[in-house]
UniProtKB/Swiss-Prot annotation:
It comes from Malacoplasma penetrans (strain HF-2) (Mycoplasma penetrans). Coiled coil: none annotated. One of its GO terms (molecular function) is DNA binding. Transmembrane segments: none annotated. This is Probable transcriptional regulatory protein MYPE8020. Its main location: cytoplasm. GO terms for biological process: regulation of DNA-templated transcription.
Length: 248
């Protein structure tokens, strides 16, 4: 998997203000706790939401407040994933959490129209992504052989179901290693790798592109405006695409 995936995955974060991101993270925690209960060990969605919140510096106090607040919250939110196409066949997945689906879909249609794209049928875009746990590790003072040795050691420490392949992919980049794991082993493998002294830069269970689309400057500018609109929309939780790089 090329390095440009790691660059593209950062676009959304750079454009999102910390306050806006914090609100979206808190909203997901509250919704996850309300649907699946307040215990993250028994609620995978809540566990993932807390993990992402901590990585983005949301305080433990705020996390607890939102978990506890979910019990008394009378609002009813519906979560959905929308798929769409952008310029040059760009593929996009959008996660929403909304109390008004009609408002949400109307807004998304407007964003896609300005992008010169369109909303797609369900599951027509997701075949360009895999859903897995991505672990990004610093390669400072770490060779590929060292990494593979530590991965094998970590696998010895966890219980693996027959026929499962916990490690889906490993890739070496200029300044980091990328490991993609099966979601159900994500937390255990990450914990073991941390215990073995590896420096984890970033980690998340997410959709990861399997192929990429490059855009010219004009189309890339449209994509940036599209992301700005999505990031400012309180109904939109996240956006991911298979954007590769800008071409002249």
């Amino acid at each position: 998997m090329p390095r440009k995936h790691l660059i593209a995955s950062g676009i959304n974060k750079k454009q999102q203000t910390q306050a806006k991101l914090g609100n979206k993270l808190a909203k997901e925690i509250k919704a996850a706790a309300k649907v699946g209960g307040p215990n993250p060990e028994a609620n995978p969605r809540l566990k993932a939401a807390i993990d992402k919140a901590l990585q983005n510096n949301l305080s433990k106090e705020s996390i607890e407040k939102n978990i506890n607040g979910s019990i008394k919250d009378p609002s009813s939110l519906t979560d959905a994933e929308y798929e769409g196409y952008g310029p040059n066949g760009l593929r996009i997945i959008i996660k929403t959490l909304s109390d008004n689906d009609n408002r949400t879909i109307s807004s998304l249609r407007g964003y896609f129209s300005k992008l010169k794209g369109e909303i797609a049928k369900p599951n027509s875009v997701k075949n360009s992504f895999i859903y897995g746990g991505e672990i990004i590790i610093s390669n400072k003072d770490l060779t590929e052989d060292d990494l593979m040795e530590k991965i094998l050691l970590s696998l010895e420490k966890i219980e693996v179901t027959d026929n499962d392949e916990p490690i889906q992919e490993t890739n070496q980049h200029e300044d980091c290693f990328q490991i993609i794991v099966m979601p159900k082993y994500f937390y255990k493998i990450r914990q073991e790798l941390e215990t073995l002294g590896l420096k984890i830069i970033e980690s998340e269970i997410k959709y990861i592109p399997t192929d990429y689309v490059d855009l010219n400057k004009e189309d890339y500018a449209r994509l940036e405006r599209f992301l700005d609109s999505c990031n400012e929309d309180d109904d939109v939780q996240w956006v991911i695409s298979n954007f590769g790089e800008v071409i002249e």
